[in-house]
């Protein structure tokens, strides 16, 4: 567990943080006065590290605009789903040449209308573990139930002409327990019918990168980001860790 490992490092008086056994130790003061890039071996103490909680190290990164953002919480997604459920599914958009639709009304007081659209391949439904479906009017709990059974789930809402993705603050795609997000700045969402091009492939794999591409979404990648402050008595150096 990285967090307990970092705490142990923090407690040790001196920790060798880099390898390079062939190099002699260089003081941080010398490194701070040098021009990059150079390769050094240091002997230093870990003064602080950020963030303090390991889960806060996970961010979303856009390789196109190089932005870093926080991973939205489940409450944000739930709020967007609730907002989209206000608009009832448009029956005119059901049962097209490339998806079959099922609609029902919930038995609770709200009597929500839910529609699920199962994408077909060669005019046939695929096995659940290979199926992409779209859901309108579902709650967070219902969406997660579907991800346990089906390969891909895309939350959508209906307009007069087509199904469309929700606000990009919500994941545009869920696969297993992974939520995939798009960059709001760099994405230009296309109509959902763009997915029919993948359904027409010989063996649709429903890969997130391909789905993002046909839907005009710039896919955000999960990255691991940390900052360490190292000291050795001659100076303090900030070291950043950034990794996919």
What are these regions (language model features)?
Residues 232-234:
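Acidic/polar residues in short coil/turn loops that connect beta-strands
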Residues 240-244:
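A beta-strand/beta-hairpin structural motif
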Residues 1-222, 226:
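OB-fold nucleic-acid-binding modules
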């Amino acid at each position: 567990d990285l967090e307990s490992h970092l705490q142990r490092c923090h407690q040790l008086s001196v920790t060798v943080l880099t390898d390079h056994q062939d190099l002699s130790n260089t003081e941080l003061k010398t490194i701070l006065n040098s021009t990059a890039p150079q390769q050094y071996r240091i002997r230093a103490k870990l003064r602080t590290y950020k963030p303090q909680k390991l889960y806060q190290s996970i961010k979303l990164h856009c390789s196109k605009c190089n932005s870093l953002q926080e991973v939205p919480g489940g409450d944000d997604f739930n709020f967007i789903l609730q907002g989209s459920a206000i608009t009832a599914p448009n029956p005119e958009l059901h049962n097209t040449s490339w998806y079959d639709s099922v609609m029902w009304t919930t038995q609770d007081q709200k009597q929500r209308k839910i529609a699920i659209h199962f994408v077909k391949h060669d005019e046939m439904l695929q096995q659940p573990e290979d199926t992409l479906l779209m859901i309108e009017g579902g709650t967070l709990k219902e969406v997660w139930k579907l991800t346990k059974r089906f390969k891909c789930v895309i939350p959508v809402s209906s307009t007069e002409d087509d199904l469309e993705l929700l606000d990009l603050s919500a994941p545009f795609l869920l696969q297993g327990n992974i939520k995939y997000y798009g960059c709001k700045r760099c994405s230009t969402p296309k109509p959902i019918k763009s997915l029919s091009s993948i359904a027409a492939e010989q063996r649709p794999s429903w890969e997130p990168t391909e789905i993002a591409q046909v839907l005009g979404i710039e896919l955000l990648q999960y990255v691991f980001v940390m900052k360490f402050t190292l000291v050795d008595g001659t100076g303090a150096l900030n070291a950043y860790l950034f990794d996919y």
